[in-house]
UniProtKB/Swiss-Prot annotation:
Nucleus found in the keyword field: yes
Start and end residues of each stretch annotated as Leucine-zipper: 341-369
Protein name (Swiss-Prot/TrEMBL): Protein L-Myc-1a
Gene: mycl1a
PANTHER family per the UniProt record, alphabetical: MYC PROTO-ONCOGENE (PTHR45851)
UniProt biased composition (Acidic residues): 187-197
Low complexity composition-biased segments: 269-284
Span of domain bHLH: 289-341
PROSITE patterns linked: BHLH
Tissue-wise expression: Uterus.
Region feature Disordered, mapped onto this chain: 172-226, 243-306
Length: 372
């Protein structure tokens, strides 16, 4: 298999990474894969400096709508802190080439070997170091002469919107008529630091209930736990000792009619008849009469049953004097007494037949004596 030839394509000058025959004298594991050198790509150029301080008047103070919200960009730390610590330069001196530096820093190098990376790193750091030295000298000269920063120098600044076009939504919500004030400057999760004041005013307490006390409480919420800009909300909370016997203060006055006792329901329905067409006085009267008739029949049945048991108890010889006999005992004793009555009735019927036969015999004897 022949070696990979990289002299064609886009004219890149790259070395061979795969070879036909592996040299046994050289350690194969000393070579590093392209993915292992990815962190060295960040050492090519320093991270772009922070935005200049807004000390001028006019439109240069707010290049983008986000600056009007009091947005302060977080401090960007470079990967090579030692390099930045040794060279402190003025951002105003390199604004002429700021766009190209940002674009070059965002685009990673396509070289894959450590040898080429070191060459590019040394080649790029040399002009940057010279530029930093020149900017330091110019800054010292301005400080000695006391020349203030003019608008022409600030005009050389590159707007972040020109390099990174990121739309920032800007929306304000007007305050409502209920007395609550709400200010929302952006709908994104990572929006700027906002402070929303919510004030609840209750001027008319409900009838028969003590006025509730509302205390404003500040709550700090951070959408990003590692973000430097938490959100503060002023919320009016309702603090009241719970009384479970009293109705809830948030319920409507119409709900009080639903917890009335059942005995007062006919009067409420009859009084609210003109407002609701479904309930009428005739319907309520018919329901009341039906319920009264049912109750009357039930009471009459119970009274009749009680009187019957009392009468039955009086007929039984052994239970006539006891007033606390149960119904089961009364029924049992009544059954036994009834059986006794039936047996005595049969015995008396037999005696009656015998007496009647004897009577017939005596009548025939009397008639025979008369004929003789």
């Amino acid at each position: 298999m022949p070696g990979v030839n990289t002299q064609t394509l886009y004219g890149w000058d790259m070395e061979h990474y795969f070879y036909d025959e592996m040299d046994t004298e050289e350690d194969f594991f000393k070579s590093t894969a392209p993915s292992e050198d990815i962190w060295k790509k960040f050492e090519l150029l320093p991270t772009p400096p922070m935005s200049p301080s807004r000390t001028l008047d006019g439109d240069w103070l707010f290049p983008i709508p986000g600056d009007r919200l009091g947005w302060a960009p977080p401090k960007v730390l470079t990967c090579d802190e030692e390099y930045e610590g040794l060279h402190k330069f003025d951002p105003l001196d390199i604004f002429g080439n700021l766009g190209s530096i940002v674009i070059k820093d965002c685009m990673w190098s396509g070289l894959s070997t450590s040898h080429r990376l070191e060459k590019v790193a040394h080649g790029e750091r040399a002009p940057v170091a010279a530029l930093i030295q020149n900017s330091t000298a110019q800054k010292a000269a301005r400080a000695a002469s006391g020349t203030p920063v003019t608008g022409s120098q600030a005009a050389q600044c590159v707007s972040p919107a020109a390099v990174l076009e990121l739309p920032v939504p800007h929306k304000k919500v007007a305050a409502g008529s209920s007395g609550s004030e709400c200010r929302s400057d952006s709908s994104d999760d990572d929006e700027d630091d906002d402070e929303i004041d919510v004030v609840t005013v209750d001027n008319r307490p409900k009838r028969g209930r003590p006025p509730s006390r509302r205390t404003p409480v500040t709550i700090t919420v951070s959408a990003d736990p590692f973000g430097p800009c938490p959100k503060r909300f002023h919320v009016s909370l309702h603090r009241q000792q719970h009384n479970y016997a009293a109705p809830s203060p948030d319920t409507d006055p119409e709900d009080d009619f639903e917890i009335e006792p059942v005995s007062k329901r006919p009067r409420l329905e009859s009084s609210s008849a003109p407002s609701s067409p479904l309930s009428s006085p005739a319907t309520s009267d018919s329901e009341d009469s039906t319920e009264q008739r049912r109750n009357f029949l039930e009471r009459k049945r119970r009274d009749d049953l009680r009187s019957r048991f009392q009468a039955l108890r009086e007929e039984i010889p052994g239970l006539s004097g006891s007033s606390k006999t149960s119904k089961v005992a009364i029924l049992t004793q009544a059954t036994d007494y009834l059986l006794q009555l039936h047996s005595s009735q049969r015995r008396q019927a037999q005696e009656k037949r015998k007496l009647k036969a004897k009577q017939q015999q005596l009548l025939r004897r009397i008639s025979a004596l008369q004929n003789s």
